[in-house]
């Protein structure tokens, strides 16, 4: 693919903060810096990458940028080893027998701890082959990686199996966060997910937080962390490093 050879893909980073406004992590998002169209979001090209077998190359680009960023933040004494960056893993990647090897090839190159990489999988992926999913997750967790369930509440996984999956985190989808202020149902769904996460000893992150009213309410609801435009828009690694440094110094 010409765009890969031309280095047009890169990771953008969106910070996650806790209820004390401390930066606790970030999510890495693939972007295509198209020479004519400008910055293109992942939803426009990921299906094509999946179809033509380029998805692993894109993941490696993102992981490469994550490692560079983590090392820069460490070198400037901005983070410690508890800081982690999330990366989205597709169904085909998760099912690949090469996933663990691909991950270690890159993090070993940069001397990054596996525990600083959080693998985000969607809720729907949990229900495809439960036994295989648990085995694959346990193998990667044994190697040090962390797991997060992205867009929780939008899929069809059985809650009875949720405790069997060795995940660290649930992420509440933006579609629910949008409704917490003006919908009793929206509020109750978000509160239920938070309570469920707490009962299973999982961290819960709210995605798509855009207003101070949402932030304040989620804080009262005992959320663990938040991300969204209110905190910061996604930034390239240089922009993120500056943002993180400024916000760490301000704390």
Residue ranges and their predicted role:
Residues 1, 10, 46, 59-67, ...:
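Short amphipathic alpha-helical segments
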Residues 1-48, 88, 149, 227, ...:
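Active-site core of bacterial EAL-family cyclic-dinucleotide phosphodiesterase domains
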Residues 5, 9, 54-55, 67, ...:
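Inter-domain helical "communication" segments and dimerization helices
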Residues 18, 22-27, 54-132, 208:
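Catalytic core of bacterial c-di-GMP phosphodiesterases, primarily the EAL and HD-GYP domains
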Residues 35-36, 90-97, 116-131, 143-251:
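EAL-family c-di-GMP phosphodiesterase catalytic domain
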Residues 43-47, 56, 134, 138:
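Conserved long alpha-helical elements within nucleotide-processing catalytic cores of c-di-GMP signaling
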Residues 106-109, 135-143:
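Catalytic-core regions built around general acid/base machinery
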């Amino acid at each position: 693919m010409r765009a890969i050879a031309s280095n047009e893909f890169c990771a953008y980073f969106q910070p996650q903060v806790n209820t004390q406004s401390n930066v606790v992590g970030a999510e890495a998002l693939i972007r295509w810096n198209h020479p004519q169209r400008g910055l293109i979001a992942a939803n426009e090209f990921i299906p094509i990458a999946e179809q033509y077998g380029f998805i692993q190359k894109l993941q490696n680009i993102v992981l490469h940028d994550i490692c560079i960023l983590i090392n820069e933040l460490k070198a400037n004494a901005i983070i410690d080893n508890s800081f982690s960056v999330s990366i989205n893993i597709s169904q085909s990647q998760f099912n690949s027998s090469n996933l663990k090897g691909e991950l270690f090839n890159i993090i070993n190159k940069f001397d990054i701890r596996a525990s600083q990489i959080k693998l985000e999988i969607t809720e729907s992926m949990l229900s495809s082959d439960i036994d295989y999913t648990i085995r694959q997750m346990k193998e990667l967790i044994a190697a040090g990686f962390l797991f997060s369930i992205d867009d929780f509440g939008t899929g069809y996984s059985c809650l009875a199996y949720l405790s069997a999956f060795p995940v660290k985190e649930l992420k509440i989808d933006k579609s629910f966060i949008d409704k917490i202020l003006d919908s009793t149902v929206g509020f109750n769904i978000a509160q239920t997910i938070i309570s469920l996460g707490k009962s299973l000893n999982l961290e819960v992150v709210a995605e798509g937080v855009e207003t101070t009213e949402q932030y304040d309410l989620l804080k009262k609801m005992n959320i663990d962390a938040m991300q969204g435009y209110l905190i910061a828009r996604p930034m390239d690694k240089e922009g993120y490093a500056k943002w993180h440094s400024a916000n760490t110094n301000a704390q």
